[in-house]
Curated annotation (Swiss-Prot):
InterPro entries: FCP1_dom (IPR004274), HAD-like_sf (IPR036412), HAD-SF_hydro_IIID (IPR011943), HAD_sf (IPR023214), Ubiquitin-like_dom (IPR000626), Ubiquitin-like_domsf (IPR029071), UBLCP1 (IPR051658). One of its GO terms (molecular function) is protein serine/threonine phosphatase activity. Its EC number is 3.1.3.16. Dephosphorylates 26S nuclear proteasomes, thereby decreasing their proteolytic activity. Recruited to the 19S regulatory particle of the 26S proteasome where it dephosphorylates 19S component psmc2 which impairs psmc2 ATPase activity and disrupts 26S proteasome assembly. Has also been reported to stimulate the proteolytic activity of the 26S proteasome. This is Ubiquitin-like domain-containing CTD phosphatase 1.
Length: 318
């Protein structure tokens, strides 16, 4: 029996009607390669489930019980697009130093060995999509420790250490941004903390996916030696049809995490000593307003996030 499917990718829809129930998921991917130029190993097909898990390449399409004209979202980037994305920017590109680090340290973003590490992460690091990326939305990448909660103070529950206005902040941000959590810890810890804070179960917003320390890379800097950083190129390389340097912003309390993407980082004030500061910390409340203001811009890379408060005061005074 012939199947009729509609594949959504890169803002376009591709109808497929040449496949049968005896064909496999891999056959489907090869058909898509001829239409999109994306290699099968670069593809991720959302919605194709078999026994509660993503369907493997050898699963026959017939057992998936697909209805006629089922729409399936495909993720993946062409090789040539990936190479272009991973390439260092032109020499005349001006990069604004968004945080207090030495200028020579910023140069690490252009080094071949660091770009090669990102390419390996794009190829090898597995991301579990919790909620599909939404077309037309910008990307907000959030650190956890000291950004969303105080992880050092003692308390009976995580709620006591949660940064004020966290859920209000995420609810507002979700209107304009897909939300990704990236912590320099293990995925098991991240999942537990998001559950404890009520983030993963909140019905007012959704987390697109989460990244752990394995998605980070180590870079060498002239004065600081080896440091671990969070390269946004890993996300852009995997989901370039949705996210890029022009529509992404990352919050972190550690400036060096932006070394590979200084233009996209906003250094948030760390939330510490929750019991003393819970009633006066309004960082997320103000940043929520900033995100709302800049969400209307076509290109976030032209902003200097170091001066986000100055930008907000200026906009609200108009």
């Amino acid at each position: 029996m012939t199947l009729s499917l509609i594949i959504k990718w890169g803002g376009q829809e591709f109808p497929l009607s040449a496949l049968s129930e005896e064909d496999t998921v891999l056959d489907l991917k090869h058909s898509l390669k001829s239409l999109t130029g994306v290699l099968p190993e670069r593809m991720k097909l959302l919605g194709l489930k078999y026994k509660g898990k993503p369907a493997e390449n050898d699963v026959k399409l017939g057992v998936l019980k697909l209805k006629p004209n089922t729409k399936i979202m495909m993720m993946g980037t062409r090789e040539e697009s990936l190479e272009e994305m991973m390439a260092p920017p032109p020499e005349n590109d001006e990069v604004v130093n968004d945080f207090d680090i030495e200028e020579e340290v910023v140069e690490v973003e252009n080094r071949e060995e660091n770009l090669a590490k990102i390419s390996r992460r794009v190829k090898d690091y597995k991301i579990e999509i919790l909620n599909p990326p939404r077309e037309g939305k910008k990307l907000l990448v959030l650190d956890v420790d000291y950004t969303l909660f105080d992880h050092r103070s003692c308390a009976e529950t995580g709620q006591e250490l949660m940064r004020p206005y966290l859920h209000e902040f995420l609810t507002s941000a979700y209107e304009d941004y897909d939300i990704v959590i990236w912590s320099a810890t293990s995925m098991k810890w991240i999942e537990a903390k998001m559950k404890e804070l009520g983030v993963s179960t909140n019905s007012n917003y959704k987390i697109t996916f989460m990244l752990d320390s394995a998605a980070m890379i180590t870079v060498h800097t002239p004065r600081r030696g080896l440091v671990d950083v969070k390269p946004l190129g890993v996300i852009w390389g995997k989901y370039g049809e949705f996210y890029n340097k022009n529509n992404t912003i990352m919050f972190d309390d550690i400036g060096r995490n932006f070394l590979m993407n200084p233009q996209n980082g906003l250094k948030i004030r760390p939330f510490m000593k929750a019991h003393l500061n819970r009633d006066k910390d309004k960082e997320l409340l103000k940043l929520s307003q900033y995100l709302k203001e800049i969400a209307q811009l076509d290109d976030l890379s032209e902003l200097n996030h170091k001066h986000w408060e100055r930008y907000l005061v200026k906009k609200q005074g108009q």
